[in-house]
Amino acid sequence: MTDQGLEGSNPVDLSKHPSGIVPTLQNIVSTVNLDCKLDLKAIALQARNAEYNPKRFAAVIMRIREPKTTALIFASGKMVCTGAKSEDFSKMAARKYARIVQKLGFPAKFKDFKIQNIVGSCDVKFPIRLEGLAYSHAAFSSYEPELFPGLIYRMKVPKIVLLIFVSGKIVITGAKMRDETYKAFENIYPVLSEFRKIQQ
């Protein structure tokens, strides 16, 4: 399993990450179709790590420790898996949930596994003038500090949303492939450098 993005562990490939910074993957959201109807009440009663409160939410919420994830399992057989730190771990976790459902007596399959969202983050290690950035990139930016402390930057290519904080911390969301996360960060990095706050 390649788990890139551990700062300081290997030298950064500057051809792919010219900024010298590799965003760390924080959360992967994936979906899969178990391709059979499920009795959620029966699953909740038999599985140790499951909760089901149909008045609150129409899915069983199941958790496993390894990889540390949460699954939402719907009566239609659709499942959402969140919390994994890499695509491989997300798929591994989804397979484990499918196996748990199989062991409870349902003919669960593993169809159409798909990564739906990758959330990454990084720290450029310098403060950013968000007002200036918002003003000069008004078409892509929304910045209302009294509502939310970060600037929301909607990049068109790749179609990614970045949350940019004055501290230099960046959250990158909306990618379906990790390379989009990396590309979006490399696209924004020169802009962040341009609006670097000069320390007095």
From Swiss-Prot:
The modification N-acetylthreonine is found at T2. Disulfide bonds: none annotated. Gene3D superfamilies: TATA-Binding Protein. Belongs to the TBP family. This is TATA-box-binding protein 1. Keywords: Acetylation, Activator, DNA-binding, Nucleus, Repeat, Transcription, Transcription regulation. InterPro entries: TBP, TBP_CS, TBP_dom_sf, TBP_eukaryotic. It is found in: Nucleus. The keyword Transcription regulation applies. Belongs to the TFIID complex together with the TBP-associated factors (TAFs). Binds DNA as monomer. Interacts with TAF1 (via N-terminus). Interacts with MEE12/CCG1. Associates with PWP2 in the nucleus. Component of a nuclear protein complex containing at least TATA binding proteins (TBPs, e.g. TBP1 and TBP2) and ATX1. GO terms for biological process: DNA-templated transcription initiation. It comes from Arabidopsis thaliana. GO terms for molecular function: DNA binding.
